[in-house]
Amino acid sequence: MQQTNLLIGTSAGVYELTGDGPRQDPALGSREVTALAAADGVAWAIADRRSIVRRGSDGTWTDVARSDEFDLVCLLPMPDGLLVGTDEAHLLRLDDHTLGRVAPFDAVEGRDAWYTPWGGPPAVRSIARDLGGRIHANVHVGGIPRSLDGGARWEPTIDIDADVHQVVAHPSEPDVVLAAGAVGLAVSENGGASWRIEQQGLHATYARAVAVAGDTILLSVSNGPRGGRAALYRTTHDLQLEKCTDELPEWFDGNID
């Protein structure tokens, strides 16, 4: 079987990028795939916003569980199972083909103050586990609650109005956690206990997505929720943020998620 280098979720199924180029994986057909995650040779996906599907090492996709109550948003494979973030800002854990609520997350301090700018319910947009084992759940809009004990207890971190859109854990620095928010790039060097905001070098502060590639942090920024003058930034050798320009347009119209 050709080695898969990248899986791409779309509104009409999953595409694989291999050494031979992209091709659609026929196993999921035209099902909408809104989230992907991988660990230990297994890929996970959210299909049709309600189903969890798993891709084994042989490339076969299998439906594992379905949520009848909430739309599913994001995935985090864990050593002891799979965590799933949902609309209405809940966490679910996959246990023997059943999705059950992580009840302590529903009781985290400050939950009553979570909101969205348009008045709808908040959502868990992304989840990350750092190399120290701490779990960080990005709520939009509700900060980044974290757990030090695998999800048994949760505590709030970062100001809610930082309006965080994504949280990621650094793949090689145990205590470094990064977040993209409406205030810029949020950086924690102590596993989420405290945060600082980096804005220097950015043309605007509204950050939508963050990723780490080797020693480089990548950040997308725009004028606001509706996009406009969106651009990609990267950190330099001295950790300053600079705009990426080679082979890219000066600005993107929409937000880069």
Region annotations inferred by a language model:
Residues 1-257:
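Extracellular glycan-interacting surfaces
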